Structure formats: structure tokens, C-alpha cells
A protein has these predicted regions:
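Conserved catalytic cores of phosphodiester-cleaving nucleases, focusing on short active-site segments
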Residues: 65-67, 72-87
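Short amphipathic beta-strand/extended segments with alternating polar/hydrophobic composition
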Residues: 22-24, 75-81, 166-173
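Non-catalytic C-terminal interaction segments of nucleic acid-processing enzymes
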Residues: 124-181
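Feature captures the catalytic cores and cofactor-binding loops of soluble hydro-lyases/lyases
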Residues: 83-140
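N-terminal intrinsically disordered, cationic/polar leader segments
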Residues: 2-3
Length: 181
């Protein structure tokens, strides 16, 4: 695995969460920089005191990110891509909140069409799609050592570095009922 470091300054006005975490991210040999950067983006969107990266692509049954409380109970379960219904149901059964961060329009549109009916029944689930051009622009910002300012307001995400700025307008395919996203 290749190791990346990300120094972040996060201002999430939607959630009232502010922090300056330093993340160490292991990139699996088969993982693209786009997916790596989307994991960082997911971390920023769901930032929390105990949020951490899962063991990676080769670890079945473990999310891309998760947050546990002091008792070990799972608060937040984050999946990337287009997980099957069984995986999402399992996540919902084990955690308080589930986020699916979908990307790759060619894959996401048919996936969502096929799972929408089943996944719409899961109250604690949020599904966000990141448009291809914005995911590609974010991937282009990947460096082994990164420094970003991330601002989230009105569900829009701005990622700024010394060399580039990306505005991400996530498309909410499904919002969790009775919770901010």
C-alpha cells in the first residue's frame, strides 16, 4: 500500500463541525486516486472524533469509513461506489447511520435504478452521487502529502489547495429521514 497524508481544515457549516485533522490514508494497490480522494471527501462530509478508515478494498464486510462510540457501537457506516442491497442492509443493521457515496455515472445510474426501491425503505440511509467531472477534478488534486481547506455549506462542498479549487455539488439520491446530512 502507498501512504498518503492529508492536512485538512474543515468548516462544515451544515453540521456545525470544525476541525483540523491530519489523516494518514493507505492506498490499496488496486485503488484509483479518484477513489482515494472520494474516501477523503467522505471523511470531510462525515467528520467526527472517532471516524476512521476501514482496512480497505481487500477487507470484505468492513466499510470504507466508520465511526464508533466509546462502547464500540457503530455510529456511522460509509460505503463508496455501488454496494449491493445486502451490504447496505447489513450496514443499516449494525450502525445508526449509513452513507453511500456513489461515483462513476455510467455505473451509478443503472445501479440506483435497480436498488432504489429496496434502499428507499431504509430510513437511516443517505445516498449521495458525486458527478464525474467533479470527482475527476478532486482526483487531480491527489498528492502523497496534501493540504486542503474544505468548506461545506448548503450541501455544496468546496475543496481548496494551494494549486487548485474544486466545487462539488453532490446529488442526493436519497436523504436519511429525521437527520441532517
Amino acid at each position: 500500500a502507498m501512504v498518503y497524508k492529508a492536512q485538512l481544515s474543515i468548516s462544515n457549516l451544515d453540521r456545525g463541525w470544525y476541525g483540523q485533522p491530519v489523516l494518514t490514508i493507505a492506498r490499496h494497490p488496486s485503488e484509483t486516486e479518484k477513489r482515494l480522494m472520494l474516501r477523503v471527501l467522505a471523511w470531510c462530509v462525515r467528520a467526527g472524533e472517532h471516524l476512521e478508515f476501514g482496512r480497505g478494498l481487500s477487507s470484505d464486510g468492513e466499510p470504507a469509513l466508520w465511526e464508533t462510540d466509546d462502547t464500540g457501537a457503530i455510529i456511522e457506516w460509509v460505503e463508496l461506489g455501488a454496494p449491493d442491497v445486502r451490504t447496505v442492509r447489513k450496514a443499516a443493521g449494525k450502525s445508526e447511520h449509513v452513507l453511500v457515496l456513489a461515483y462513476d455515472e455510467a455505473r451509478t445510474k443503472p445501479w440506483w435504478k435497480s436498488v432504489k426501491g429496496e434502499l428507499s425503505k431504509i430510513d437511516k440511509l443517505t445516498v449521495i452521487f458525486i458527478p464525474d467531472s467533479e470527482a475527476d477534478a478532486l482526483a487531480a488534486m491527489a498528492l502523497r502529502s496534501m493540504k486542503f481547506a474544505v468548506t461545506i455549506q448548503d450541501s455544496v462542498i468546496w475543496v481548496n489547495s494551494d494549486t487548485a479549487d474544486v466545487q462539488i455539488n453532490p446529488e442526493y439520491l436519497k436523504r436519511e429521514t429525521q437527520r441532517w446530512t
